Amino acid sequence: MTSTGKDGGGAQHAQYVGPYRLEKTLGKGQTGLVKLGIHCVTCQKVAIKIVNREKLSESVLMKVEREIAILKLIEHPHVLKLHDVYENKKYLYLVLEHVSGGELFDYLVKKGRLTPKEARKFFRQIISALDFCHSHSICHRDLKPENLLLDERNNIRIADFGMASLQVGDSLLETSCGSPHYACPEVIRGEKYDGRKADVWSCGVILFALLVGALPFDDDNLRQLLEKVKRGVFHMPHFIPPDCQSLLRGMIEVDAARRLTLEHIQKHIWYIGGKNEPEPEQPIPRKVQIRSLPSLEDIDPDVLDSMHSLGCFRDRNKLLQDLLSEEENQEKMIYFLLLDRKERYPSHEDEDLPPRNEIDPPRKRVDSPMLNRHGKRRPERKSMEVLSVTDGGSPVPARRAIEMAQHGQRSRSISGASSGLSTSPLSSPRVTPHPSPRGSPLPTPKGTPVHTPKESPAGTPNPTPPSSPSVGGVPWRTRLNSIKNSFLGSPRFHRRKLQVPTPEEMSNLTPESSPELGHLQLFGNPVSKVRSVAMELVILVQTLAYTSFRLLGTFLPVRYLRHSVLSRPPERARLVLRGAPCTHMGPVWNMVGMAYTQNPPIMGETGVYGSQWVMSSAPSKHYTSLGLSVPSPSCSLSPSLFPFCAPDTTNCMEVMTGRLSKCGTPLSNFFDVIKQLFSDEKNGQAAQAPSTPAKRSAHGPLGDSAAAGPGGDTEYPMGKDMAKMGPPAARREQP
């Protein structure tokens, strides 16, 4: 743990773990404190579990490493997620998902007891997550309301896998662990036991506590409590539904052989009752191809270390022998599950860390050079300085080069789960296996090669960084996925709600606010079902507020379009527009963002602002964050950065309009209006000097009063007419 700040009296010290600033203490676990962490750029909240290496024994530290490896195996909506792992000589930091609802224990104490309907909701989510764990041979062994957290929507998150164990095949567990009130009789007797059966008993005790508000076995004397658990005799209140009583008796059964399994529980009449109640969210099945490993060189060292941390593969030679075997086995299944996790969520070095001086700062566990899915070793990742000079990557802004020289190269160790958090891709390109073709809004450093297109719509040079040669021949779908992944990072970020700006925020939409560009993340993961088209426009105006109202005036007359004004931070203006639902694609969202593309203008001069909108259509739960500002030093129309769009802006607009007009959709009118706005803007810029403000659009009802209009906090009325859209036209693929 590190601290920065002045040493004078009354100075505030800020403690950081990587990009996260440590705040208040959330709780205290068995191995250390849990503190709230806030990302210094994105303001994402996380829970950071701090483990003191010096105060814990080697066996306890091995349990922590086992917890890390187990959390990599589990990806379920009702299991707390692991983002990253940091460490230094004294501490180990686990960056976990933050949930704001607190413990189920506190919720139960507050409400006394729950209704059968609410108890069934929680119970279903617990069983769903536990069934997923058991299918991956993981037993929790410490289930209790204190380890069940609630998110902002009162959904369950199973936490604290410090006691969890991997139970392979028909083997039995020996370690007696857990809480006496929730432990099964065979664990208390010190016998070998089935971890899956022990978890079922604990779930039965939890369900009883939810319905009754008290525990089935309780006593102030620990010896008496253990005797009650061994006998398994408890009082069943009359207000518990009869069907639920039979379920409880089947789960809280002393004889482990007669105890219900998770399969029987999920088929029980009380569990499947309540037809109008929503089913627990099911995770996307992970199908991993198990292939043969020809030699030891083909085994990933990070995955091998993670498997060794699980505890059940302590014989390293036997583990290697099983992995190299031609037959499919449990060891190979776990190996390829961990390898799949590492492939999908690679852990990279941090960028854009706050400037600070520490003797022993926490360092992120990053991936070592590893093998890809085809058995070929990937080249070692290089630092940003090397990429900018040798491999033709995006040039590093001067600000980033200075910061990286101050911080130095981050150390590399065992792989940890990656949160994928990044700052704005405009200000600091992210190191990824596939270089991202993104530019920088900041001035290009001296000595960095640039090229100028032969023709520029505005007649001015348009210096851009040279494109990376490594992505030239890759199909556009692969490049699109690479761009989306570098934009969004790991899907494991905590989703943030969009805030409607206050009048003060909208009144401060001026270039003097800040030249820094923030990163906007709207929704969840990018999925293949999302269909989107993107456009960008660079406008010469004096204030950003004028640009906002001008575009807003363009959107107002479009039918079937609902919109609201967003802003974060104040120097960026955004609009979210919701169109009519499509028959096959679902609701249509349009994101419009505006930000500086050059330095803030001096009073009396014009400023250059970039505007991009993205129309995406998908089921509501699949919406992705595609509303990112596009940098462009040019004062003219610029080609879209998305590779599936036409290289020419006007042609791209024609492609989008034609594609949508085939559906007969009301949104085709929207693109017609925008296309006309583009045409007027292009003609206006061609007739004027680059320093002259562009003509105001005549399409919007705001007219010349747009710049002096009301505060941007006004939420305009949403359209009442919601028309059905026809089937979408096929996407036009371009190489």
Swiss-Prot record:
Signal peptide (from-to): none
Which stretches make up the UBA domain? 298-340
Summarize where ATP binds, as residue positions: 26-34, 49
One Gene Ontology term from the biological process aspect of the record? actin cytoskeleton organization
Which InterPro entries does its entry note? BRSK1_2-like_UBA (IPR048622), Kinase-like_dom_sf (IPR011009), Prot_kinase_dom (IPR000719), Protein_kinase_ATP_BS (IPR017441), Ser/Thr_kinase_AS (IPR008271)
Q: In which compartments does the protein localize?
A: Cytoplasm, Cytoskeleton, Microtubule organizing center, Centrosome; Cytoplasm, Perinuclear region; Endoplasmic reticulum
Q: What is its main location?
A: cytoplasm
Catalytic residue list: 142 (proton acceptor)
Residues with Phosphoserine modification: 295, 368, 383, 394, 413, 424, 428, 456, 513-514
MF term (GO), any: ATP binding
One GO cellular component term, please give it. Answer: endoplasmic reticulum
What the entry says about post-translational processing?
May be phosphorylated at Thr-261 by PKA. Phosphorylated at Thr-175 by STK11/LKB1 in complex with STE20-related adapter-alpha (STRADA) pseudo kinase and CAB39. Not phosphorylated at Thr-175 by CaMKK2. In contrast, it is phosphorylated and activated by CaMKK1. May be inactivated via dephosphorylation of Thr-175 by PP2C.
User: What residue spans carry the region label Disordered?
Assistant: 346-476, 493-514, 682-735
What EC identifiers does the entry list?
2.7.11.1, 2.7.11.26
Keywords of this entry: Apoptosis, ATP-binding, Cell cycle, Cell division, Cytoplasm, Cytoskeleton, Endoplasmic reticulum, Exocytosis, Kinase, Magnesium, Metal-binding, Mitosis, Neurogenesis, Nucleotide-binding, Phosphoprotein, Serine/threonine-protein kinase, Transferase, Ubl conjugation
- Biased composition regions of type Low complexity, renumbered to the chain: 411-429
- Bias kind Basic and acidic residues: ranges: 346-367
- Kindly indicate whether the keyword Endoplasmic reticulum belongs to this entry: yes
Recite the other comments. Answer: Protein synthesis is inhibited by the TSC1-TSC2 complex acting through TORC1 in neurons, leading to regulate neuron polarization.
Report the sequence similarity comment from the record.
Answer: Belongs to the protein kinase superfamily. CAMK Ser/Thr protein kinase family. SNF1 subfamily.
How the protein assembles, per its UniProt entry? Interacts with FZR1, a regulatory subunit of the APC ubiquitin ligase complex. Interacts with COPS5. Interacts with PAK1.
Q: Its biological function?
A: Serine/threonine-protein kinase that plays a key role in polarization of neurons and axonogenesis, cell cycle progress and insulin secretion. Phosphorylates CDK16, CDC25C, MAPT/TAU, PAK1 and WEE1. Following phosphorylation and activation by STK11/LKB1, acts as a key regulator of polarization of cortical neurons, probably by mediating phosphorylation of microtubule-associated proteins such as MAPT/TAU at 'Thr-523' and 'Ser-573'.
- Name of protein: Serine/threonine-protein kinase BRSK2
Q: What is the scientific name of the source organism?
A: Rattus norvegicus (Rat)
